[in-house]
Amino acid sequence: MPEFQERVRNFFKESKRVFLVTKKPGWEEYKKAAKITGLGILVIGLVGMLIRIIGILMLGG
């Protein structure tokens, strides 16, 4: 049991270090990330739709 407690303590210590180094993104960075995410969702949706259309055309159903 002490080993588990030590692992949990180390995890929180490392997590605290990460939070101290990171920073909150600015508005421009947020907009860029949102655009890239939206574009990725759109591309994945289009690929799925194309696969579905090809399947319908090949299998007739």
UniProtKB/Swiss-Prot annotation:
Per its UniProt record, what PROSITE patterns does this chain match? SECE_SEC61G
Locations listed in the record: Cell membrane
**Record GO terms (molecular function):** protein transmembrane transporter activity
Keywords per UniProt = Cell membrane, Membrane, Protein transport, Translocation, Transmembrane, Transmembrane helix, Transport
Membrane topology per the record? Single-pass membrane protein
Q: Name one GO biological process term.
A: protein targeting
Q: What does this protein do?
A: Essential subunit of the Sec protein translocation channel SecYEG. Clamps together the 2 halves of SecY. May contact the channel plug during translocation.
Q: What is this protein called?
A: Protein translocase subunit SecE
Annotated source species: Pyrococcus horikoshii (strain ATCC 700860 / DSM 12428 / JCM 9974 / NBRC 100139 / OT-3)
